[in-house]
Structures are given as structure tokens and as C-alpha cells.
Curated annotation (Swiss-Prot):
The active site is at residue 216. It comes from Mus musculus (Mouse). Its EC number is 3.1.3.48. It catalyses: O-phospho-L-tyrosyl-[protein] + H2O = L-tyrosyl-[protein] + phosphate. The modification S-nitrosocysteine is found at residue 216. This is Tyrosine-protein phosphatase non-receptor type 2. One of its GO terms (cellular component) is endoplasmic reticulum-Golgi intermediate compartment.
Length: 406
């Protein structure tokens, strides 16, 4: 099976057909209703206006007045794999994120982005980075950091999630890939596969637990790549025939726009081909991945790619990064080039709005804390004044009494 995919990869490379193949997938993807995401009360729960969960596959929050969260359940029955693909939490949705993790009985969260990329906030800081716990009063949860294992390109956190109302606690593994550029690909399949198998070894992807929560910024590009590669490798381990294009089309029925660029599609093939060596019984392959990935070196900086490509999620355009299109009919390429600049500006504006909104919320929190302190002072001020006055009288009386009898 891996030989078939390898031949397909070589043909696509030789014929420079990654762009056309990607466009085929994009154009053949179905569009499904996503009305709930567009409700007025849910607008501030979406990081991007054009990335929404379908109504039929969206994850619903339980025991809340509003059950909406921008997250989709991707269920691949033949591989016995279920993933929750979601956007990077916003400041106002971190509480909903942890509620979802609890209700879905998730064992691990896989994070494939940095909180800030290219000076834009891509994700709120929803987990603690020190000994101080984070409390989410809106949904009644707290999160503590138990341990942290930092590698050169990923970090594993062990978190304690507590239901404040019941006192019940659960341990959640947080796998954070720190060097995967937005709209780009990891430096090598070896580093990615080493990370993927690290996640697998935790057991969090098996049907014995609730679905793993996987997110990047929008929950479609990097998250889609991770899910596609893992699913293909599972099917190959089972001896099943794997049609990568068809599998991706099936996964796109659950969440729009999975895999955002031809480069991500090409990288998925590379990772599947390399990962298949392990399924064939090459026991030393994981050791080679670890050596090639150099995970034990000091953490390195994120290498962002300054490229833009126009993406269309099942018929709806969204902003991407600059990348010239090749191998397309001239009319299609001209249309893409004409609209790429305006689409990029739109994505940048949305990122700036999200950043501004986060800063405004932080300012409001500081103002609220200042106001609470002021009210506490106004409450105690007259009491303390009276106590001081009474103390002065008592001291005066004591002094007078002492002088009188001496």
C-alpha cells in the first residue's frame, strides 16, 4: 500500500500536479449548513468569520444556556479514530474549551501553533505556565500545571483539570508542537512523526478514551494535516487500502477546509510514506526519527514563511499566506492573484481585531479589579475611621486615668 502512495507521490512531484490536485479536492468538497455559528450571540465565539463548524458535526456543550463552541467532531469509523478539531481558544472561550474537554472525556490536547505568530495573537493562553492555577468561574473549572518536558521543537505539559463544583480531578496531557509555521509545514517528516508517535504512545488517540482535542489557529490547516496522517497510518497498520484524496474529502465532510495549502498536502504524503516504514516492522525507524529531529537540543525559534496562498473552504474564500500559484489555467491564476492581496488584508484585520479584543478584555479586568478594591476601601473606610476615633478616646481616657491617680 505504501508503495502505491509512494508512486503517486513521485508522479505528482514529476508532473508538478500538487496545485491541481489540491484544487480538485477543494472543488469536490461538499458544503454543509453552519447556521448556528452565524447566530448573533455566537459571533464573538469565532476566531475567524469564515471558519465555522457544520451544524451536523459541531460539538455541543452540555448544561449551558448556549451550547456553541467552534469545534467539530471528526469521526473516522474504519480507523476507529475520533478527533475534535477546534480553533485556538479566544479569551472569552477558554472556559468553554475546558468544559468541552471535561464533557468529552478527553485525555489529551494537541496544540500545533504558538500563541503569537507574526506579531498576531493566534490563541489565548488557556493553560498555566507556572505554579499558579487558572480558574474559569464561568464554567466551574480550574487548571494546574503538574509538570513540563521541554524539547527542541515541542513541549509536553501534564495538567490537572478540576471540576470546582464536584472536586473531581483529571490529568490531561498537553502536547504542544512549537515550530510548525502557520500555512506552512514542519522542517521534516522525521520531527513531525516523532511528535505524532509521542502523542500516540500516551494512548490518548485510542477509542478507550474520549476524542483527543486537536487545534491550531483556525483548526483546519495544521490540525487537518495531523489528523489525516494519523488516520492514514492507522488504516495502513490494519492492512486497509488507503486513498489519501478520498479520505481527505471524507474528513472535510466533518469540518470545512481541512489542509489549507498544496504544501501541506504534499507534506502529508511525505509523512505517510515515511510513517509507513514503521507499520512494516522497521523497529529502528523511531530511533532514526528522534535522532534526525534533534529533540534534545535547546528549543529553537519558529521559522515563519513569508508566503501567501488563497484558500477557498468548500467554496468560500478565506485569507491565506502569499504563495504564487503554478500549474493553473491563466484565468484561474489571474483571479487568484487579483484577490490574494485583499484576502490577506482581511485575515490580518481579523487577527488585529482579535488581538485588540484580547487587550481590551485584559484592560477591563484590570479596571474591574481596581473598582473592586475601591469599593472595598469605601466600605471599610468609615469603619476604620470610627475604630480609630474610639481608639483615640480610649487611649486618652487611659492617660487621664493614669495621671489622675498618680
Amino acid at each position: 500500500m505504501s508503495a502505491t502512495i509512494e508512486r503517486e507521490f513521485e508522479e505528482l512531484d514529476a508532473q508538478c500536479r500538487w496545485q491541481p490536485l489540491y484544487l480538485e479536492i477543494r472543488n469536490e468538497s461538499h458544503d454543509y449548513p453552519h447556521r448556528v455559528a452565524k447566530f448573533p450571540e455566537n459571533r464573538n465565539r469565532n476566531r475567524y468569520r469564515d471558519v465555522s463548524p457544520y451544524d451536523h458535526s459541531r460539538v455541543k456543550l452540555q448544561s449551558t444556556e448556549n451550547d456553541y463552541i467552534n469545534a467539530s467532531l471528526v469521526d473516522i469509523e474504519e480507523a476507529q479514530r475520533s478527533y475534535i478539531l477546534t480553533q485556538g481558544p479566544l479569551p472569552n472561550t477558554c472556559c468553554h474549551f475546558w468544559l468541552m474537554v471535561w464533557q468529552q472525556k478527553t485525555k489529551a490536547v494537541v496544540m500545533l501553533n504558538r500563541t503569537v505568530e507574526k506579531e498576531s495573537v493566534k490563541c489565548a493562553q488557556y493553560w498555566p505556565t507556572d505554579d499558579r492555577e487558572m480558574v474559569f468561574k464561568e464554567t466551574g473549572f480550574s487548571v494546574k500545571l503538574l509538570s513540563e518536558d521541554v524539547k527542541s521543537y515541542y513541549t509536553v505539559h501534564l495538567l490537572q483539570l478540576e471540576n470546582i463544583n464536584t472536586g473531581e480531578t483529571r490529568t490531561i496531557s498537553h502536547f504542544h508542537y512549537t515550530t510548525w509555521p502557520d500555512f506552512g509545514v514542519p522542517e521534516s517528516p522525521a520531527s513531525f512523526l516523532n511528535f505524532l508517535f509521542k502523542v500516540r504512545e500516551s494512548g490518548c488517540l485510542t477509542p478507550d478514551h474520549g476524542p483527543a482535542v486537536i487545534h491550531c489557529s483556525a483548526g483546519i490547516g495544521r490540525s487537518g494535516t495531523f489528523s489525516l496522517v494519523d488516520t492514514c497510518l492507522v488504516l495502513m497498520e490494519k492492512g486497509e487500502d488507503v486513498n489519501v484524496k478520498q479520505l481527505l474529502l471524507n474528513m472535510r465532510k466533518y469540518r470545512m477546509g481541512l489542509i489549507q495549502t498544496p504544501d501541506q498536502l504534499r507534506f502529508s504524503y511525505m509523512a505517510i510514506i515515511e510513517g509507513a516504514k514503521y507499520t512494516k516492522g522497521d523497529s529502528n525507524i523511531q530511533k532514526r526519527w528522534k535522532e534526525l529531529s534533534k529533540e534534545d537540543l535547546s528549543p529553537i525559534c519558529d521559522h515563519s514563511q513569508n508566503r501567501v496562498m488563497v484558500e477557498k473552504y468548500n467554496g468560500k474564500r478565506i485569507g491565506s499566506e502569499d504563495e504564487k500559484l503554478t500549474g493553473l489555467p491563466s484565468k484561474v491564476q489571474d483571479t487568484v492573484e487579483e484577490s490574494s492581496e485583499s484576502i490577506l488584508r482581511k485575515r490580518i484585520r481579523e487577527d488585529r481585531k482579535a488581538t485588540t479584543a484580547q487587550k481590551v478584555q485584559q484592560m477591563k479586568q484590570r479596571l474591574n479589579e481596581t473598582e473592586r478594591k475601591r469599593k472595598r476601601w469605601l466600605y471599610w473606610q468609615p469603619i476604620l475611621t470610627k475604630m480609630g476615633f474610639v481608639s483615640v478616646i480610649l487611649v486618652g481616657a487611659l492617660v487621664g486615668w493614669t495621671l489622675l491617680f498618680h
